[in-house]
């Protein structure tokens, strides 16, 4: 079942895939990485000018990585806000997604956190560097296939 935004995008020939609705009834769309920067600008101009959150996750060990954007459009008042969830999947071998920092400035720290924890490179991000882990940290700690270097359990310390 397609939502109103999916229908609107399809009428304009914008490539996307509807993933249905989440448990709150929020429409979820999949956008290809190569289309994300242009569709982000279109969504902003259409009224989705508030980025509620951006996060990322590891879909499966050895599988894809996903960057998730929750956008809000407030046209008829706060009580009638329209929300959409955008998912951009990328291969873990070369995880690159265009940064939307230039569209929504609030993605600054959020894209940096996704880079720091999962290794997704956000192209054209002005300050893409580690934000939580030290610069010397090796690897991406939230990937499902991550093996912590020199890791031991607390019980092994005694």
From Swiss-Prot:
Gene3D superfamilies (alphabetical): NADH:ubiquinone oxidoreductase, 30kDa subunit (3.30.460.80)
UniProt protein name: NAD(P)H-quinone oxidoreductase subunit J, chloroplastic
Species: Barbarea verna
EC number(s) recorded for this UniProt protein: 7.1.1.-
InterPro entries named among the record's database cross-references: NADH_DH_suC, NADH_quin_OxRdtase_su_C/D-like, NADH_UbQ_OxRdtase_30kDa_su, NADH_UbQ_OxRdtase_CS
Pfam families given in the database record: Complex1_30kDa
Matching SUPFAM superfamilies: Nqo5-like
GO-annotated cellular components: chloroplast thylakoid membrane
The keyword Ubl conjugation is assigned to this record: no
Complex and partners: NDH is composed of at least 16 different subunits, 5 of which are encoded in the nucleus.
Main location: plastid
Catalytic activity entry: a plastoquinone + NADH + (n+1) H(+)(in) = a plastoquinol + NAD(+) + n H(+)(out); a plastoquinone + NADPH + (n+1) H(+)(in) = a plastoquinol + NADP(+) + n H(+)(out)
Family (UniProt): Belongs to the complex I 30 kDa subunit family.
Subcellular location as annotated: Plastid, Chloroplast thylakoid membrane
Enzyme class, broadest EC rank: translocase
Any one GO MF annotation of this record: quinone binding
